[in-house]
């Protein structure tokens, strides 16, 4: 009677390790969060809802306040005084954690360190809060006014929050037994800050804002 060949398989354990990296902004970070008003207008357009009223008057300070990702409660008083009061009460701001991972993945691919973008998605993870945000530390945000082109080349004025002298901490989890070492991952994240950046007018989008490096 023939016996079955037994094959011994070695299962390499996934040994996760979490480290904290500090990134420091090299150029100011410009935020442009989607406001509830913008989301509603987009939904109405997609649903072909007929609008009977005229376009609301632009409120620069409100646009500025709503352009930022608030970790604390956004002020209901959309005035300079309301914003200053929120700052005095310890307002905190964040940024989507996915932006930093996407910057790293894109930079690695652009520099020829990885054959494609898909292969890096499961190599490391960046921890965020319950809303997948990381806190941005900086000077008090300032309001910037920019002329932009929207739609069919129509000119518009945008008011957005600019963060100077900013920094953040990234909690990175990776597999110590994986294909990429911690040193390689750190270099990929560092390249992401130079090649791609985050936020509006970042290097990846023909700008020079939102660049950063890993502090040593």
Task: List where the protein language model places each region.
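RNA-interacting cores
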Residues: 1-216
């Amino acid at each position: 009677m023939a016996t079955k060949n037994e094959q011994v398989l070695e299962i390499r354990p996934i040994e996760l390790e979490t480290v904290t990296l500090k990134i420091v902004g090299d150029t100011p970070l410009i935020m442009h969060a989607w406001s509830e008003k913008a989301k509603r207008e987009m939904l109405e357009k997609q649903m072909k809802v007929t609008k009977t009223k005229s376009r609301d008057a632009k409120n620069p300070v409100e646009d500025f306040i709503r352009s930022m990702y608030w970790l604390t409660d956004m002020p209901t008083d959309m005035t300079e005084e309301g914003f200053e009061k929120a700052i005095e009460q310890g307002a905190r701001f964040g940024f989507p954690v996915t932006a930093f991972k996407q910057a790293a993945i894109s930079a690695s691919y652009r520099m020829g360190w990885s054959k494609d973008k898909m292969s890096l998605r499961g190599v490391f993870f960046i921890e965020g809060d319950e809303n997948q945000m990381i806190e941005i530390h900086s000077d008090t945000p300032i309001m910037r006014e920019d002329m932009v082109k929207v739609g069919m080349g129509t000119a518009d004025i945008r008011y957005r929050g600019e963060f100077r002298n900013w920094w953040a901490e990234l909690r990175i989890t990776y597999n110590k037994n994986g294909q990429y070492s911690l040193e390689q991952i750190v270099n990929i994240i560092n390249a992401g800050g130079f090649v791609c950046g985050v936020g509006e007018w970042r290097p990846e989008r023909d700008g020079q804002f939102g660049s950063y490096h890993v502090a040593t």
